[in-house]
Curated annotation (Swiss-Prot):
It catalyses: GTP + H2O = GDP + phosphate + H(+). It is a peripheral membrane protein. Belongs to the GTP-binding SRP family. FtsY subfamily. Coiled coil: none annotated. This is Signal recognition particle receptor FtsY. It comes from Sulfolobus acidocaldarius (strain ATCC 33909 / DSM 639 / JCM 8929 / NBRC 15157 / NCIMB 11770). Residues 20-42 have a biased composition (Basic and acidic residues). Its main location: membrane.
Length: 369
């Protein structure tokens, strides 16, 4: 189940607090109404008691007119007072506390500082100066503003359809290289991509260019066997670029559609790894570069993304372990700060648990009840 609980809670709490401020006026209005009614009844009773039956009819008529005039004045004053309570213009002072609380909750949900400030600025611009009359109107303004702001962030980058990109390239083989540090689920994600490509009638081959971690080749061999695809591998410590070159050459000779290259992922601060990746890139000349990020890594995932962008560059992101992500802010941060699209999300351990990323899907999950 994918729900992004913490991000949902942040927006829900803000909505409750800002609309709750309007509700405070309702009891006051009802209480004032009751007091005014009681006053009118008392005045009427007093007038009735004070009118002797023996008084002149002309005097009675004058008193009656006087009472009616007084009542009309009171009714007019009451309407003006109720209009004052019914409609309220939202001021910046009304928002300061709830905005600060939302800022803290967004940052705690892995939303970067820059994205948080944009969302809060959009909210203030759309709320301050608005004349609102009821809770539902406040909710509508807040929800529409948040949805628009988040959608704009996520759609700044052109949507990438990987299958269409492969087919329209006219190139065979189409070479895809995968980056990512150890532990992000890179090997499993590559297997999921192979499964997806096969279901779209695209033949594939895997290059095991992570020759420094022995388990990496064994893991890929296991998945390749289950998926019935060819795996090109080298000895432990072999040249990763040579493995990639051999896989591409094999694909050309067998008319294979796509080559998927796994790469080493020790640490993103490892300078030797960066040089190794640059060499693989020079030899393989990939058509598409995908960075694998763990959605549970929070701000560290953003730092990894910055490092790979600055050193080797990439075209798109696949987020893993999204099914376990209770925060949900990393996708917003990636889209806004690095201008990189999230193309797929890993939502489980099965090969079919790879789904396309959609801004509409993301917004729906955040604001679903």
């Amino acid at each position: 189940m994918i729900c992004f609980d913490r991000l949902k809670k942040a927006f829900s709490n803000f909505l409750d607090k800002i609309s709750g401020e309007e509700n405070k006026k309702e009891p006051e209005t009802r209480q004032t109404d009751q007091l005014e009614s009681k006053k009118e009844e008392t005045i009427q009773q007093q007038q009735n008691v004070q009118q002797p039956q023996a008084e002149n009819k002309i005097e009675q008529k004058q008193e009656k007119i006087s009472v009616q005039t007084g009542q009309e004045n009171k009714q007019e004053n009451k309407r003006s007072f109720f209009d004052f309570l019914k409609y309220k213009t939202i001021k910046e002072d009304d928002l300061n506390d709830v905005i600060e609380e939302l800022r803290f909750q967004l940052l705690d949900s892995d939303v970067s500082y820059e994205v948080t400030e944009k969302i809060l600025e959009d909210l203030k611009n759309n709320l301050i100066g608005k004349k609102v009359s009821r809770r539902e109107e406040v909710e509508e303004i807040v929800i529409n503003t948040l949805k628009k702001s988040i959608t704009e962030i996520l759609t700044k980058n052109q949507k990438t359809d990987l299958i269409e990109k492969i087919r329209s390239s006219g190139k065979k083989p189409f070479v895809i290289i995968f980056f990512g540090v150890n532990g992000v689920g890179k090997t499993t994600t590559i297997a999921k991509v192979v499964n997806m490509l096969k279901k779209n009638n695209l033949s594939t081959i895997i290059a095991a260019s992570d020759t420094f971690r022995a388990a990496a080749q064994e893991q890929l061999a296991y998945h390749a066997s289950k998926l019935e695809v060819q795996l090109i591998r080298g000895k432990y410590g072999a040249d990763p670029a040579s493995v990639a070159f051999d896989a591409i050459s094999f694909a050309k000779s067998r008319n294979i559609d796509v080559v998927l290259i796994d790469t080493a992922g020790r640490m993103h601060i490892d300078s030797d790894l960066v040089e190794e990746l640059k060499r693989v890139l020079r030899i393989a000349k990939p058509d598409f570069r995908i960075l694998i990020l763990d959605s549970l890594a929070g701000s560290d995932a953003l730092e990894q993304a910055r490092h790979f962008e600055n050193n080797v560059g990439y075209d798109a992101v696949i987020l893993t372990k999204v099914d376990a992500d209770a925060k949900g802010g990393i996708a917003l941060s990636l889209a806004y700060e690095l201008k990189k699209p999230v193309v797929y999300m890993g939502v489980g351990q099965n090969y079919d648990d790879l789904i396309p990323f959609s801004p509409d899907w993301f917004v729906e999950r955040i604001f679903s009840s």
